[in-house]
Amino acid sequence: NVAALLASPLADGLFQKAIIQSGIVSVASLSEAESDYPSDGVSGTISSQEILYQLLINDGIAEDLVAAKRHLANLTSSEIAGYLRAQTPANLLQAEQAAKPRKVGMTRVFPDGVVVRSDGIVGALKDPARTKVPVLVGTNRDETKLFNAMDPHLVEWGQPDGLWSFIDRMPLTIKNPNYYEAMSEYGSDFWKLRATDDVARSLTQSEQTVFAYRFDWDELPTIQDLDYADLLGAGHAMELLFLFPAAMEQTLVSKFVIGDGAESADRLSQQMRNYWAAFAYTGKPNLGLPAPQPTWPVWQAADNVERFLVLDSDQDQGIVSSTAALTLNGLLAKLEQDPRFDLMGRCQALYGLTYRNGDGIDPAAWQTFAAGQCLDRDYQTVTQLLERQQF
């Protein structure tokens, strides 16, 4: 995680530039990581205690969780340390998988005060005393579509026919296109808020130079009557194909992703690689380009100024600068009025969007969202759907 390295005191001064693509800046909870799970098994972080219990069960030392806790209570710290250090990586990973709680999401770094500062990644980025390096940071417009496309509650999968019948399972149709687009839009915007806009604001606050982008290319083909621009769009990791273009020549990528847009995709790829290479060499994506390209603006905190670059092909909007900026209050206000949802839908959307996102949403935001009408609702069905997702 480049963001974690950028924020780590141990890495301070070890590099001259940093590129953060679709980063994660939220951190795990130390208290949850060091404690037993509550009785309902809901926790946002995998517990080291629970992993240790699972190891004792897997090794046959304890029959169940109760026995594992009883056995552990009789061990000294040095005995526990010796037991853990004797475990193989495979044993540790197997125990971690079995010990996952309800609600836990993507693995996040721990603000242990040594490797990562106790005030977390964002806190470190705001510190003007840190060594200053130029940063290139961004996300893709439709980040969450890659994950939503694999959710059987949102997309119907099945056996394709015709030319594609040799494939066992493919996405066949989006069950509710308006809902799918809305959930993907908010999920991706929340990601951009945390991973681009908030990061850029924090770095700018500490007087660092930031170049931000949003990748918008979505000229995917239609397969089995399903438009992959709607299904995947500018999804997570899509920009990597344009930075490592040899992947575009692979048969599946050329058929399922690039389609007939190879020429414009190649042009965008070359422009992106020019920017990335210039930044890697000089810390300035506009310096030393082999041919004229749109100027990449430095992120600025002022209102109504060009602050990030939109990366798209010349068959669409092309490469353009944008003055847009996301804020939590702005996203919540937009969701609160979005006609694609009724009130219950808005409440469920906010619940789902924030269920596994690490730092979560400030409880005060829940108090004020929709005048507090989302506070006392039953989210059990949504929770069950979220916990069945396997990405």
Task: State each model region's role.
Residues 149-166, 291-297:
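Short Gly/aromatic-enriched secondary-structure transition segments
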Residues 24-25, 37-40, 154-159, 230-236, ...:
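Short, low-complexity, polar/charged sequence segments that are solvent-exposed and flexible
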Residues 9, 87-91, 96-99, 170, ...:
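Alpha-helix boundary/capping residues
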Residues 79, 161-162, 377:
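Coil-to-alpha-helix initiation sites in intrinsically disordered, low-complexity, charged segments
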Residues 170-182, 249-260:
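Short glycine/proline-rich turn/loop motifs
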Residues 201-391:
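Mobile gating loops/cap/lid regions near enzyme active sites that modulate substrate access
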Residues 3-7, 12, 17-157, 181-205, ...:
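Substrate-access "cap/lid" subdomains that shape
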Residues 166-168, 186:
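Domain-core and long-helix interface of multi-subunit machines
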